[in-house]
Amino acid sequence: MSVEHPPIGEANTEPAAGGCPVTGRLRHPLQGGGNHEWWPNQLNLKVLAKNPAEGNPLGDFDYKAAFNSLDLAAVKADIAEVLTTSQDWWPADFGNYGPLMIRMAWHSAGTYRSSDGRGGANTGQQRFAPLNSWPDNGNLDKARRLLWPVKKKYGQNISWADLMILAGNVALETMGFKTFGFAGGRVDVWEPEEDVYWGPEAEWLGDKRYSGERDLENPLAAVQMGLIYVNPEGPNGNPDPLAAAVDIKDTFGRMGMTVEETVALIAGGHTFGKTHGAGDAALVGAEPEAAPLEQMGLGWKSSHGTGKGADAITSGLEVVWTTKPTQWSNDFFEILFGYEWELTKSPAGANQWVAKDAQPIIPDPFDPAKKRLPTMLTTDLSLRVDPEMEVISRRFKDNPDEFADAFARAWFKLTHRDLGPVTRYLGPEVPSEVQLWQDPIPAVDHELVDAADIAALKEQILASELSISQLVKTAWAAASSFRGSDYRGGANGGRIRLQPQLGWEVNEPDELARVIAVLEGIQEQFNAAQTGNKKVSFADLVVLGGVAAVEQAARNAGVAVEVPFTPGRADTTQELTDPEGFAVLEPKADGFRNYLGKANPLPAEYLLVDKANLLTLTAPEMTVLVGGLRVLNANYQRSPLGVLTETPESLTNDFFVNLLDMGVVWEPSPADDGTYVGKDAATGAQKWTGSRVDLLFGSNSVLRSLAEVYATDDAKPKFVQDFVAAWNKVMNLDRFDLA
């Protein structure tokens, strides 16, 4: 529903050009003002300093141990008690908060988008802005307050992130549905995630994210600002079920859901509960972030009647889908296909549909003596009018057990999508069946290599035809596919030699294939020579190759260093790898390799910071890695851009020394290709070339201050030490067994 909300705040998208670039009075820093108001396009490096230890009230807390100490059955029993204990301050529809908890869990997980892995339930972000105040999350603040007694009782043994998802599962189970399972392991954070791009709009329900016919901007999935998925009234409130079907399939597809999973989720979720649109939405007050202090973090206070219970207003729609809203059934499909539908308005004026020639068979949420006519949303009718979804819907209607299984699996996928591989799952209800979307890696079934083996393998790798550059690039390509947003990717599994990673442009497929062949030969030779069960995996060998190369490059620079290496990675197979599912991990840019693909929405330096953010790097770690990778000659296609050294493949601090050299003047390349030329200030002779990413470390004041640390005459040992530490961090980002 198109409810008016205060604007988020107009964004100044114009670059600062001389003089003060702002108008009006600047805000106090405590009000959100600061440098960004003067220079709105300033690179935001704060995304590389997320969730600092100083902001964590728990300190060095072992959540895994705490969660595993829980009596999960007792927690679930306490949640179940909450569900059927109606509170006067927010009465339960049909005497059961189960549907409200399902919506809370759904919307916690449903912000996930597969394109960058951001969003989702993993850190409990629904507690914070902007999500706690999105129009689509209206009155979910009440759901979390209802759960407070449970959270209070069990304290830090269960995170809010886990509790919200568990409450959704308990709601389903207590209403007669058999879930697929539940895994804990979501760790709370203590601040909003401000590195997530939710869209360009500066007002609720705006849709500037579209271009062309209806092309949705990447990486977004939702159709409008402040919605989790689609507009239930139809595109921009237009009650066209067929047009809404296009949005549904696009949006759910961008979450990583198939069309069958999408149908199952919509129908399964809408088997329970109701929507709320009892009256004029203009009577609803401000969202939590804009509400007055005395409301204590609760928003959407309504002056329509009592403002709650039978008078509640949330979406503005007033729909009850089934005859048994607190019981699992096949009613949704029976009713969807059992009637013809005509457009009507809710009491709040929202577009919805009512059954023609129907009897009032739908229960009232608060008066058992009353019955209602069957009603549906525009997006519900999409499941009937869209040819592809109709076939699935009719099959589910005629095969209730198949529908129940599909919903159970889709719900589990929805609520666990950003939790990472099964090795991160906690608790007694983790299902034994592994799903393809979990990126399965077989368990290590052999003895691991020891220190002597590692030393011998490093010698053999360095004696091969492979260069330091090739070894570094291959290890980086494998490990840097990791995303800290949803814990996907990384070197474990050895997927660098499988499709689609083997064919990614940034990985230089032809050269990569040659490197893989050599490493596989070394692996086969080593494994064949063993008499017992000792083996080296290909995944371990890729990382070990990088380790050997970095150590040799340091020796070339006159520094002896031992790069840490812990074996234990396993090799997966092409059959256990979904090429379409992995395609979203392909880098469109990688500033660490000076790679910039085509049609990127932001300049290369912004994309570098985004990549560093996904790799969970700090600004110093990003800085030292870029400088080190440049002198290791690890650029895409061995480009000379930023290779500011006369001795490539030596781990020197030359990149920083030469970048900050005042005897070099930089200017845009005459090729007008976005690159730069560094010339001798005295002679005008060309000395170097560089990219926007390279020059960033001399231009940006914060990054220049970091570059200066590594450019001093006494910096070489520290540079090598810090590079090795950052390199080792990236190589082990997906080693959850080491945590």
Swiss-Prot record:
CC terms in the record's Gene Ontology section: cytosol
SUPFAM superfamilies associated with the record: Heme-dependent peroxidases
Q: Which domain of life is it from?
A: Bacteria
Instruction: Enter cross-link residues for Tryptophyl-tyrosyl-methioninium (Tyr-Met) (with W-106).
Output: Y229-M255
The residues annotated as the active site are: H107
Catalytic activity, as annotated: H2O2 + AH2 = A + 2 H2O; 2 H2O2 = O2 + 2 H2O
Q: What is its EC number?
A: 1.11.1.21
The record's section on InterPro entries has: Catalase_peroxidase, Haem_peroxidase, Haem_peroxidase_sf, Peroxidases_AS, Peroxidases_heam-ligand_BS
Note the NCBIfam families from the entry.
cat_per_HPI (TIGR00198), PRK15061.1 (NF011635)
Q: Which cofactor does it need?
A: heme b
Q: Which GO terms describe its biological process?
A: cellular response to hydrogen peroxide; hydrogen peroxide catabolic process
Q: Does the keyword Heme apply?
A: yes
Which positions in this protein are listed as binding heme b?
Answer: H270
User: Assembly state and interactors?
Assistant: Homodimer or homotetramer.
Q: Report the family membership.
A: Belongs to the peroxidase family. Peroxidase/catalase subfamily.
Q: What is this protein called?
A: Catalase-peroxidase
Q: Where is this region: Disordered?
A: 1-33, 113-134
Enzyme class, spelled out? oxidoreductase
One matching Pfam family: peroxidase
Q: Where is this site: Transition state stabilizer?
A: R103
